[in-house]
């Protein structure tokens, strides 16, 4: 029933107007599963390879015809007649077919699109919602939770054309009892922030992930604006709402220094750890992502020793959803959380393996979108299915972001109280 009858792929556009891969997996019973691969802007150097054409005459060289051809040719031939419900076997066939450490032959974007489309097709054929099927694949059948959203309401760094160095300033509604209420709180704060910025004569255009992207005198000015917005929305910062940062430090780490060009400051690893610690002293920041460069493991150790007992320290560029790298981090006591991005590793199976490794080691796993997104909502189901407890999927604006939030609303409704929203206790160091 769940045997694969056909696979086909096409070039579609992501939220930045760049091509990405969409794959259809059709089963013998006629069931269709469809999925798109996302794409990042600030990428870790050890991520699986996103295959692009490099043909300057099309899409500025960013076309993905090679990846589409890989799906319509080699991948299709290898998977026809295989069981879409056997996720691990399907993914392993594609990994072996590629034959490289970083999926450089077929492309992580090609393999991932097929991997997710197969999972969707199997779920439909088996008469199950996607989150239920992913939980079955994960060996955690029947266990679900709703994630705390990290809402990126103010953008800087590679996600915006402004002078703010830190890439993401996020709010987390933690005092409510449901995801639906958390979404409402986030939306109210988002609209409040727009009014705060307008009152200061600042630009209210949005960045790649739907957050506002004004020019500000410092990173702390961004935090101050969010604090004012939270309070004007009627909430208490530190009680109802906590803050999270994504520094994306690799983007401003040069010659052994963390260079905050927007502020005209430069720090060594110890100094930057002190800078971040100071922000945490002045604001209720409970999570910091990529607080050090991906290659600065000594700096990561300094940061972990300084803040790791009270702040969630999330490795994104550091770990790139890769179990081999995560294992090293766990052994060395680096960070205490991992950001999970499907396309950093390139298959559903490997993504689930990374989440399990993190959770078994007492690390949290934060499910994440990419800055280049589509209408695909698979990460919403993944967050619920793995009881990850946290999700990053942008601001309360742009359909590519809101699509994931709306899917979570549907899932919460369908589960009728069987997926608790645990709030602050989901965040490492807070529960």
Swiss-Prot record:
One of its GO terms (biological process) is glycolytic process. Binds a second Mg(2+) ion via substrate during catalysis. It comes from the Bacteria. It is found in: Cytoplasm; Secreted; Cell surface. It catalyses: (2R)-2-phosphoglycerate = phosphoenolpyruvate + H2O. Keywords: Cytoplasm, Glycolysis, Lyase, Magnesium, Metal-binding, Secreted. Its cofactor is Mg(2+). One of its GO terms (molecular function) is phosphopyruvate hydratase activity. (2R)-2-phosphoglycerate binds at residues 167, 341, 370-371, 392. Its EC number is 4.2.1.11. The active site is at residues 209, 341. Its main location: cytoplasm. Mg(2+) binds at residues 246, 289, 316. SUPFAM superfamilies: Enolase C-terminal domain-like, Enolase N-terminal domain-like. Pathway: Carbohydrate degradation; glycolysis; pyruvate from D-glyceraldehyde 3-phosphate: step 4/5. GO terms for cellular component: cell surface; extracellular region; phosphopyruvate hydratase complex. It is an enzyme of class 4 (lyase). Component of the RNA degradosome, a multiprotein complex involved in RNA processing and mRNA degradation. Belongs to the enolase family. Catalyzes the reversible conversion of 2-phosphoglycerate (2-PG) into phosphoenolpyruvate (PEP). It is essential for the degradation of carbohydrates via glycolysis. This is Enolase. It comes from Marinobacter nauticus (strain ATCC 700491 / DSM 11845 / VT8) (Marinobacter aquaeolei).
